[in-house]
From Swiss-Prot:
It comes from Ligilactobacillus salivarius (strain UCC118). One of its GO terms (cellular component) is cytoplasm. Belongs to the NAD kinase family. This is NAD kinase. InterPro entries: ATP-NAD_kinase_N, ATP-NAD_kinase_PpnK-typ_C, NAD/diacylglycerol_kinase_sf, NADK. It catalyses: NAD(+) + ATP = ADP + NADP(+) + H(+). It is found in: Cytoplasm. GO terms for molecular function: ATP binding; metal ion binding; NAD binding; NAD+ kinase activity. Involved in the regulation of the intracellular balance of NAD and NADP, and is a key enzyme in the biosynthesis of NADP. Catalyzes specifically the phosphorylation on 2'-hydroxyl of the adenosine moiety of NAD to yield NADP. It comes from the Bacteria. The active site is at D45. GO terms for biological process: NAD metabolic process; NADP biosynthetic process.
Amino acid sequence: MRVGIFSNNVRRSLEVKAALTRRFLERHFIIDDENPEVVVTIGGDGTLLSAFHKYIDMLDKIRFVGVHTGHLGFYTDWRDDEIDDLVISLQSDNGQSVSYPLLDVFVTYKDSNKRDVFTALNEATIRRISSTMVTDIFIGGEFFERFRGDGLCVSTPTGSTAYNKSLGGAVVHPTLDVLQLTEVSSINNRVFRTLSSPMIIAPKDWITIEPEGAADFILTVDSDSYHKLKIKEIKFKISKKKIHFAKYRHTHFWHRVQTAFIGDEDAD
């Protein structure tokens, strides 16, 4: 089996990477960071996000496994003291995986015919730098509302527990092929009206926004940000691609949610 190892630069992560590399070589794995079958990430969710974007053109060929060297993350199933068990599981690999939906973002600009396409694992956001953002929102090709506020967040089911949740969005099980549109500090009064509620969007529907005004928009795609954009239109849709995780002992989603946000009541 060809295995790639992707680590952050924290000392503990680098120690685990070195130990894991030795064990892989002892058991005759091929270390191949360029064309892996399985990518093992060492760190946390941010490390896995970075690995996802590095291998984004190979998602149909690889599966991810996360080893966490800090707190339990949503994408990391193994602790740093369990690498021997991980190697044994990889040796008996049967190719099983669990797959989660991704978000495609299509951006067109006012000053050119260029169109950029991005893919997000968690979410994409749009906001203005210096003042209120005003934008028309279309769902499934039909006008829905004119939004005024700080910005908008479109998230995947796995991303629903990230920035989306801090905005008051719903937590969505990652086996559902849906998107979530959440407003960021919308303005609602006698003059201006928005739904002011998170929306779950069906997989067949595009979310389209046409922002109004100056060229000072910021677009974020996961942890990447793009500044001072002259945006004409952004379309969001469930991607045809998916991310695949090796299914050795993939942690139950609601257990992850309980651990991350509620914890052990007996510990209080």
